[in-house]
Amino acid sequence: MKAIVVNPPNKGVHVKEINDIHRSLTADEVLVKTIANGICGTDRGIVSGLLKFSRPPNGKNDLVLGHENLGQVIDKGPEVHGLGKGDYVVSIVRRGCGKCSNCLAGRQDFCETGEFVEAGIRGLDGFMREFYIDNASYLVKIPDEIVDIAVLLEPLSNVVKAYSELMLVQRRMTWWCKDGSYNCRNVAIVGSGPIGLMFSLMFSIQGFNAFVLNKRDPFPIEAEIVEKSNAKFINTNKDRLPNTIDLLIDTSGYPSAFIPLMSRLNKNSAIILFGTTGGEKFEVNADLITYLVENNILLFGSVNASKKDFENGVNYLTIWKYRYPSVLNRMITRVIKPEQAPEVLYTKPKGEIKTVISWV
Protein backbone atom coordinates (compact mmCIF):
# COMPACT_ATOMS: atom_id res chain seq x y z
CA MET A 1 0.00 0.00 0.00
CA LYS A 2 0.97 3.61 -0.49
CA ALA A 3 2.43 5.65 2.39
CA ILE A 4 4.18 8.96 3.01
CA VAL A 5 7.40 8.27 4.88
CA VAL A 6 10.30 10.14 6.45
CA ASN A 7 13.64 9.11 7.93
CA PRO A 8 14.02 11.25 11.06
CA PRO A 9 15.97 13.08 12.19
CA ASN A 10 17.17 13.41 8.59
CA LYS A 11 15.59 15.84 6.19
CA GLY A 12 13.31 14.52 3.45
CA VAL A 13 9.97 12.89 2.61
CA HIS A 14 8.73 10.59 -0.13
CA VAL A 15 5.80 8.42 -1.18
CA LYS A 16 6.56 4.70 -1.26
CA GLU A 17 4.92 1.30 -1.23
CA ILE A 18 4.96 -0.46 2.14
CA ASN A 19 3.57 -3.79 3.32
CA ASP A 20 2.88 -3.72 7.04
CA ILE A 21 -0.73 -4.98 7.07
CA HIS A 22 0.18 -8.65 6.91
CA ARG A 23 -1.41 -10.16 9.99
CA SER A 24 -4.82 -11.00 11.40
CA LEU A 25 -6.52 -8.63 13.81
CA THR A 26 -6.36 -9.40 17.51
CA ALA A 27 -9.61 -9.43 19.47
CA ASP A 28 -9.52 -5.72 20.35
CA GLU A 29 -8.06 -4.30 17.14
CA VAL A 30 -9.60 -2.45 14.21
CA LEU A 31 -8.55 -2.20 10.56
CA VAL A 32 -8.99 1.38 9.38
CA LYS A 33 -9.00 2.78 5.85
CA THR A 34 -7.53 6.28 5.84
CA ILE A 35 -9.87 8.93 4.43
CA ALA A 36 -7.87 12.11 5.05
CA ASN A 37 -4.89 13.61 6.84
CA GLY A 38 -4.26 17.20 7.83
CA ILE A 39 -0.82 18.74 7.37
CA CYS A 40 0.56 20.86 10.20
CA GLY A 41 3.73 22.57 11.34
CA THR A 42 4.90 19.48 13.21
CA ASP A 43 4.87 17.47 9.96
CA ARG A 44 6.89 20.18 8.24
CA GLY A 45 9.31 20.33 11.17
CA ILE A 46 9.97 16.60 10.82
CA VAL A 47 10.36 16.81 7.04
CA SER A 48 12.81 19.70 7.38
CA GLY A 49 14.89 17.78 9.94
CA LEU A 50 14.41 20.44 12.60
CA LEU A 51 12.48 18.31 15.12
CA LYS A 52 15.30 16.20 16.47
CA PHE A 53 13.05 14.30 18.89
CA SER A 54 11.28 12.63 15.96
CA ARG A 55 12.28 9.00 15.47
CA PRO A 56 11.07 5.87 13.64
CA PRO A 57 9.66 2.86 15.50
CA ASN A 58 12.22 0.59 17.12
CA GLY A 59 13.81 -1.67 14.54
CA LYS A 60 12.73 0.44 11.57
CA ASN A 61 14.56 3.00 9.46
CA ASP A 62 11.50 4.89 8.23
CA LEU A 63 8.57 6.55 9.97
CA VAL A 64 5.15 6.82 8.37
CA LEU A 65 4.26 10.48 8.78
CA GLY A 66 0.93 11.97 9.85
CA HIS A 67 -0.94 12.46 13.11
CA GLU A 68 -4.02 14.45 12.00
CA ASN A 69 -6.36 11.80 10.67
CA LEU A 70 -9.82 10.61 9.65
CA GLY A 71 -10.57 7.01 8.74
CA GLN A 72 -13.29 4.43 8.27
CA VAL A 73 -13.60 1.04 9.96
CA ILE A 74 -13.08 -1.82 7.49
CA ASP A 75 -12.87 -4.74 9.91
CA LYS A 76 -12.71 -5.34 13.66
CA GLY A 77 -11.87 -7.98 16.23
CA PRO A 78 -14.59 -9.92 18.09
CA GLU A 79 -14.16 -7.99 21.35
CA VAL A 80 -14.53 -4.54 19.80
CA HIS A 81 -17.82 -2.98 20.88
CA GLY A 82 -19.34 0.38 19.99
CA LEU A 83 -17.71 0.45 16.57
CA GLY A 84 -19.01 -1.18 13.40
CA LYS A 85 -17.87 -1.60 9.84
CA GLY A 86 -18.36 1.65 7.96
CA ASP A 87 -18.10 3.87 11.05
CA TYR A 88 -15.87 6.93 10.78
CA VAL A 89 -13.12 7.28 13.37
CA VAL A 90 -10.23 9.49 14.44
CA SER A 91 -7.23 7.95 16.21
CA ILE A 92 -5.62 9.70 19.14
CA VAL A 93 -1.93 10.46 18.73
CA ARG A 94 -0.02 9.79 21.94
CA ARG A 95 0.25 6.33 23.50
CA GLY A 96 1.26 6.06 27.14
CA CYS A 97 4.39 4.60 28.71
CA GLY A 98 2.38 2.02 30.65
CA LYS A 99 4.27 2.89 33.83
CA CYS A 100 3.39 6.27 35.35
CA SER A 101 0.11 6.95 37.13
CA ASN A 102 -1.07 9.43 34.51
CA CYS A 103 -0.58 7.05 31.59
CA LEU A 104 -2.22 4.23 33.52
CA ALA A 105 -5.22 6.51 34.09
CA GLY A 106 -5.60 7.42 30.41
CA ARG A 107 -3.84 10.78 30.70
CA GLN A 108 -0.82 10.05 28.56
CA ASP A 109 -0.77 13.75 27.67
CA PHE A 110 0.72 14.21 31.16
CA CYS A 111 3.22 11.33 30.93
CA GLU A 112 5.83 11.60 33.69
CA THR A 113 8.48 9.25 32.27
CA GLY A 114 8.71 10.68 28.76
CA GLU A 115 8.63 7.13 27.41
CA PHE A 116 5.42 7.63 25.43
CA VAL A 117 5.20 7.27 21.64
CA GLU A 118 3.28 9.47 19.22
CA ALA A 119 1.85 8.33 15.91
CA GLY A 120 3.64 9.93 12.99
CA ILE A 121 5.99 11.84 15.28
CA ARG A 122 8.11 9.66 17.53
CA GLY A 123 8.41 5.91 17.84
CA LEU A 124 5.11 4.94 16.18
CA ASP A 125 4.05 4.94 12.54
CA GLY A 126 1.47 7.55 11.67
CA PHE A 127 -1.62 7.71 9.52
CA MET A 128 -0.43 8.99 6.11
CA ARG A 129 -1.01 5.58 4.55
CA GLU A 130 -3.91 3.79 2.91
CA PHE A 131 -4.70 1.46 5.83
CA TYR A 132 -3.60 0.94 9.41
CA ILE A 133 -4.41 -1.29 12.38
CA ASP A 134 -5.09 0.26 15.77
CA ASN A 135 -6.39 -0.81 19.15
CA ALA A 136 -10.06 0.15 19.51
CA SER A 137 -9.32 2.00 22.76
CA TYR A 138 -7.43 4.64 20.76
CA LEU A 139 -10.30 5.36 18.36
CA VAL A 140 -12.95 8.07 18.67
CA LYS A 141 -16.20 7.53 16.75
CA ILE A 142 -17.26 10.38 14.47
CA PRO A 143 -20.93 11.20 13.79
CA ASP A 144 -21.83 11.26 10.10
CA GLU A 145 -22.96 14.89 10.46
CA ILE A 146 -19.40 16.18 10.92
CA VAL A 147 -17.39 13.83 8.71
CA ASP A 148 -16.63 16.69 6.31
CA ILE A 149 -14.75 18.60 9.05
CA ALA A 150 -13.61 15.74 11.32
CA VAL A 151 -10.02 15.90 10.04
CA LEU A 152 -9.82 19.05 12.19
CA LEU A 153 -10.53 17.08 15.38
CA GLU A 154 -6.92 16.27 16.29
CA PRO A 155 -5.71 19.90 16.35
CA LEU A 156 -8.96 20.93 18.05
CA SER A 157 -8.40 18.36 20.82
CA ASN A 158 -5.29 20.30 21.86
CA VAL A 159 -7.33 23.50 22.08
CA VAL A 160 -10.00 21.73 24.13
CA LYS A 161 -7.37 20.52 26.58
CA ALA A 162 -5.78 23.95 26.95
CA TYR A 163 -9.19 25.55 27.54
CA SER A 164 -10.12 23.01 30.22
CA GLU A 165 -6.74 23.52 31.94
CA LEU A 166 -7.25 27.27 31.96
CA MET A 167 -10.73 27.09 33.46
CA LEU A 168 -9.44 24.72 36.13
CA VAL A 169 -6.49 26.84 37.25
CA GLN A 170 -8.45 30.11 37.09
CA ARG A 171 -10.75 28.75 39.76
CA ARG A 172 -8.03 30.04 42.10
CA MET A 173 -10.18 33.21 42.30
CA THR A 174 -13.35 34.80 40.93
CA TRP A 175 -12.59 35.35 37.25
CA TRP A 176 -16.03 35.78 35.75
CA CYS A 177 -17.69 39.15 35.34
CA LYS A 178 -20.30 40.76 37.58
CA ASP A 179 -23.14 39.32 35.51
CA GLY A 180 -21.67 35.81 35.70
CA SER A 181 -20.43 35.82 32.08
CA TYR A 182 -16.95 36.35 30.62
CA ASN A 183 -17.87 39.27 28.37
CA CYS A 184 -15.57 41.63 30.27
CA ARG A 185 -12.51 39.44 29.60
CA ASN A 186 -10.15 40.04 26.66
CA VAL A 187 -8.26 37.15 25.07
CA ALA A 188 -5.26 37.92 22.82
CA ILE A 189 -4.31 35.02 20.55
CA VAL A 190 -0.90 35.33 18.88
CA GLY A 191 -0.97 33.61 15.50
CA SER A 192 -3.72 33.12 12.92
CA GLY A 193 -3.08 29.56 11.81
CA PRO A 194 -5.63 26.78 12.38
CA ILE A 195 -4.83 26.54 16.10
CA GLY A 196 -5.12 30.31 16.58
CA LEU A 197 -8.44 30.37 14.74
CA MET A 198 -9.74 27.43 16.78
CA PHE A 199 -8.80 29.22 20.00
CA SER A 200 -10.71 32.22 18.64
CA LEU A 201 -13.80 30.08 18.05
CA MET A 202 -13.47 28.43 21.45
CA PHE A 203 -13.29 31.64 23.45
CA SER A 204 -15.81 33.54 21.34
CA ILE A 205 -18.47 30.90 21.84
CA GLN A 206 -17.78 30.99 25.59
CA GLY A 207 -18.47 34.74 25.65
CA PHE A 208 -14.93 36.14 25.82
CA ASN A 209 -13.75 39.04 23.65
CA ALA A 210 -11.28 37.31 21.32
CA PHE A 211 -8.54 39.11 19.39
CA VAL A 212 -6.41 37.28 16.80
CA LEU A 213 -2.97 38.88 16.41
CA ASN A 214 -0.50 38.76 13.55
CA LYS A 215 2.18 41.06 12.13
CA ARG A 216 0.29 41.45 8.85
CA ASP A 217 -3.19 42.02 7.50
CA PRO A 218 -5.40 38.92 7.41
CA PHE A 219 -5.75 36.77 4.35
CA PRO A 220 -9.34 36.96 3.03
CA ILE A 221 -10.26 33.56 4.48
CA GLU A 222 -8.78 34.48 7.88
CA ALA A 223 -10.74 37.74 7.90
CA GLU A 224 -13.95 35.88 7.05
CA ILE A 225 -13.49 33.24 9.76
CA VAL A 226 -12.57 35.78 12.44
CA GLU A 227 -15.49 38.04 11.56
CA LYS A 228 -18.05 35.22 11.48
CA SER A 229 -16.89 34.02 14.90
CA ASN A 230 -17.41 37.52 16.36
CA ALA A 231 -13.70 37.96 17.04
CA LYS A 232 -11.39 40.73 15.82
CA PHE A 233 -8.19 40.52 13.76
CA ILE A 234 -5.34 42.84 14.78
CA ASN A 235 -2.29 43.66 12.69
CA THR A 236 0.16 44.44 15.50
CA ASN A 237 2.23 46.63 13.19
CA LYS A 238 -0.55 49.16 12.72
CA ASP A 239 -3.75 48.35 14.63
CA ARG A 240 -4.52 49.35 18.19
CA LEU A 241 -4.30 46.60 20.77
CA PRO A 242 -6.82 46.23 23.60
CA ASN A 243 -5.80 48.31 26.61
CA THR A 244 -5.74 45.28 28.87
CA ILE A 245 -5.46 41.55 28.29
CA ASP A 246 -6.89 38.92 30.64
CA LEU A 247 -5.55 35.92 28.75
CA LEU A 248 -2.58 35.74 26.38
CA ILE A 249 -2.25 32.65 24.16
CA ASP A 250 0.82 32.13 22.00
CA THR A 251 0.48 29.75 19.07
CA SER A 252 3.52 31.07 17.21
CA GLY A 253 6.42 29.80 19.31
CA TYR A 254 8.32 33.05 18.80
CA PRO A 255 9.18 34.88 22.06
CA SER A 256 9.42 38.19 20.21
CA ALA A 257 5.76 37.86 19.26
CA PHE A 258 4.26 37.45 22.73
CA ILE A 259 6.72 38.58 25.43
CA PRO A 260 6.26 42.30 24.61
CA LEU A 261 2.52 41.83 25.20
CA MET A 262 2.97 40.61 28.78
CA SER A 263 3.11 44.14 30.16
CA ARG A 264 -0.50 44.59 29.03
CA LEU A 265 -1.74 41.69 31.14
CA ASN A 266 -4.33 42.45 33.77
CA LYS A 267 -4.05 41.38 37.39
CA ASN A 268 -4.82 37.69 37.95
CA SER A 269 -4.52 36.95 34.24
CA ALA A 270 -2.98 33.93 32.53
CA ILE A 271 -0.62 33.01 29.70
CA ILE A 272 -0.90 29.80 27.68
CA LEU A 273 2.19 28.78 25.71
CA PHE A 274 1.18 26.47 22.88
CA GLY A 275 3.42 27.17 19.90
CA THR A 276 6.91 25.69 19.65
CA THR A 277 9.82 26.56 17.41
CA GLY A 278 13.58 26.83 17.77
CA GLY A 279 16.42 29.25 17.43
CA GLU A 280 15.04 32.62 18.41
CA LYS A 281 16.53 34.35 21.46
CA PHE A 282 14.67 37.09 23.30
CA GLU A 283 15.61 38.78 26.56
CA VAL A 284 13.35 38.66 29.61
CA ASN A 285 14.37 41.17 32.26
CA ALA A 286 13.80 41.17 36.01
CA ASP A 287 11.21 43.95 35.77
CA LEU A 288 8.93 41.72 33.71
CA ILE A 289 9.34 38.84 36.17
CA THR A 290 8.44 41.22 39.00
CA TYR A 291 5.36 42.35 37.07
CA LEU A 292 4.20 38.74 36.64
CA VAL A 293 4.76 37.95 40.31
CA GLU A 294 3.18 41.10 41.74
CA ASN A 295 0.08 40.68 39.59
CA ASN A 296 -0.55 36.98 40.22
CA ILE A 297 -0.09 36.18 36.54
CA LEU A 298 -0.12 32.47 35.76
CA LEU A 299 1.91 30.94 32.90
CA PHE A 300 1.63 27.35 31.70
CA GLY A 301 2.49 25.28 28.66
CA SER A 302 0.04 22.87 27.08
CA VAL A 303 0.70 20.00 24.68
CA ASN A 304 -1.20 17.01 23.33
CA ALA A 305 -4.63 15.84 24.51
CA SER A 306 -6.46 12.94 26.13
CA LYS A 307 -9.15 10.77 24.56
CA LYS A 308 -11.73 12.72 26.56
CA ASP A 309 -10.49 15.93 24.93
CA PHE A 310 -11.04 14.31 21.53
CA GLU A 311 -14.56 13.29 22.55
CA ASN A 312 -15.32 16.80 23.80
CA GLY A 313 -13.89 18.09 20.53
CA VAL A 314 -16.54 16.10 18.65
CA ASN A 315 -19.18 17.99 20.63
CA TYR A 316 -17.56 21.35 19.83
CA LEU A 317 -17.36 20.55 16.11
CA THR A 318 -21.05 19.64 16.14
CA ILE A 319 -22.01 22.88 17.92
CA TRP A 320 -19.75 25.07 15.78
CA LYS A 321 -21.06 23.58 12.54
CA TYR A 322 -24.55 24.65 13.58
CA ARG A 323 -23.50 27.99 15.09
CA TYR A 324 -21.02 29.04 12.39
CA PRO A 325 -22.15 27.41 9.10
CA SER A 326 -19.31 27.09 6.56
CA VAL A 327 -16.63 28.53 8.89
CA LEU A 328 -14.94 25.21 9.67
CA ASN A 329 -15.11 24.04 6.06
CA ARG A 330 -13.36 27.26 5.06
CA MET A 331 -10.42 26.32 7.28
CA ILE A 332 -9.65 23.54 4.80
CA THR A 333 -8.04 25.71 2.16
CA ARG A 334 -6.67 22.98 -0.11
CA VAL A 335 -7.22 19.26 -0.74
CA ILE A 336 -4.42 17.30 -2.41
CA LYS A 337 -3.59 13.73 -3.39
CA PRO A 338 -0.82 11.76 -1.61
CA GLU A 339 1.52 12.21 -4.58
CA GLN A 340 1.36 15.98 -4.11
CA ALA A 341 2.15 15.83 -0.40
CA PRO A 342 5.98 16.06 -0.51
CA GLU A 343 5.91 19.43 -2.25
CA VAL A 344 3.40 20.86 0.24
CA LEU A 345 5.28 19.36 3.18
CA TYR A 346 8.46 21.13 2.11
CA THR A 347 6.88 24.53 1.53
CA LYS A 348 3.76 25.99 3.15
CA PRO A 349 1.55 27.56 0.46
CA LYS A 350 0.72 31.24 0.90
CA GLY A 351 -2.69 31.73 2.46
CA GLU A 352 -2.87 28.18 3.80
CA ILE A 353 -4.90 27.50 6.89
CA LYS A 354 -5.21 23.73 6.58
CA THR A 355 -4.10 21.56 3.67
CA VAL A 356 -5.68 18.10 3.68
CA ILE A 357 -4.48 14.94 1.95
CA SER A 358 -7.36 12.91 0.51
CA TRP A 359 -6.91 9.14 0.17
CA VAL A 360 -10.28 8.49 -1.52
From Swiss-Prot:
Protein name per Swiss-Prot or TrEMBL: Glucose 1-dehydrogenase 3
GO molecular function: D-glucose binding; glucose 1-dehydrogenase (NAD+) activity; glucose 1-dehydrogenase (NADP+) activity; NAD+ binding; NADP+ binding; zinc ion binding
Pfam families the record matches: ADH_N, Glu_dehyd_C
Positions annotated to bind NADP(+): S192, G193, P194, I195, N214, K215, R216, F274, G275, T276, S302, V303, N304, K348
InterPro entries for the chain: ADH-like_N (IPR013154), Glc_1-DH_arc (IPR026583), Glu_dehyd_C (IPR031640), GroES-like_sf (IPR011032), NAD(P)-bd_dom_sf (IPR036291), Zn_alcohol_dh (IPR050129)
Superkingdom of source: Archaea
Catalytic activity, reaction form: D-glucose + NAD(+) = D-glucono-1,5-lactone + NADH + H(+); D-glucose + NADP(+) = D-glucono-1,5-lactone + NADPH + H(+)
Residues the record lists as binding substrate: T42, E118, E154, N158, N304
Binding site for Zn(2+) 1: C40, H67, E68, E154
Cofactor note: Binds 2 Zn(2+) ions per subunit. One of the zinc atoms is essential for catalytic activity while the other has a structural function.
Biological process annotations from GO: non-phosphorylated glucose catabolic process; protein tetramerization
Names of the cofactor(s): Zn(2+)
Keywords per UniProt: Carbohydrate metabolism, Metal-binding, NAD, NADP, Nucleotide-binding, Oxidoreductase, Zinc
EC number in record: 1.1.1.47
Residues annotated as binding Zn(2+) 2: C97, C100, C103, C111
Recorded family membership: Belongs to the zinc-containing alcohol dehydrogenase family. Glucose 1-dehydrogenase subfamily.
Function comment: Catalyzes the NAD(P)(+)-dependent oxidation of D-glucose to D-gluconate via gluconolactone. Can utilize both NAD(+) and NADP(+) as electron acceptor. Is involved in the degradation of glucose through a non-phosphorylative variant of the Entner-Doudoroff pathway.
Gene: gdh3
PANTHER family (UniProt xref): L-THREONINE 3-DEHYDROGENASE (PTHR43401:SF2)
